[in-house]
Amino acid sequence: MYIPDYFGQKDFDEIRRFIEEDPFAFLLFPVGDEVTTTLIPLIHEVEDGKLVVYGHMAKNNPQWKKAMDRKVTILFFGPHHYISPRWYEIRKSVPTWNYVSVRITGTLKVMERKDTEDFLIRLSTFLDAEWGKEGREKEAYYQKMVEEIVAFRVESQTVDAGWKLSQNHPMSDRKGVVENLEKAGDDDARKMAGMMRKMMEK
């Protein structure tokens, strides 16, 4: 993924925080001349200093067999928004699109049943703590869920993160972008404005 130096995000904690807040990702891998794509929620942890991502597919989804033991790419996308030159104090710039994204590559490994059970508890607790508790209390129902999925882990080989938040513009222009994003009012605009303000305060 091409990321100019001034847009690169190197703060490991920020990257982790981002993929925890936006856990829905694209899982991509080549099959012949095609690129196969799966959309799934993912959780992560750090093992020996490396980011390890965990997810699952339905057992009747044939993609997990094709991805098993192969190098895959995982893409997380956060807020993104059109940026108008009208928002700049100096209006010689071109229209552009700001965004936040993380790209992880690694080999997909299918997990054994016990690890799958542990993963499902963690995923349920992360996404819906109350429901996760109910699932553990209803053992038969919970075991049925385990039977119907294939869980996997991807230990990161590379992690690339891009925070394209107008860092290549003077502070006066960045303030103008933030003000107009806040006026836009949609969720992505508000999130992006908040991330820009946080970065500008550093």
Spans of features found by a protein language model:
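Binding-site signature for planar aromatic cofactors or substrates
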Residues: 1-202
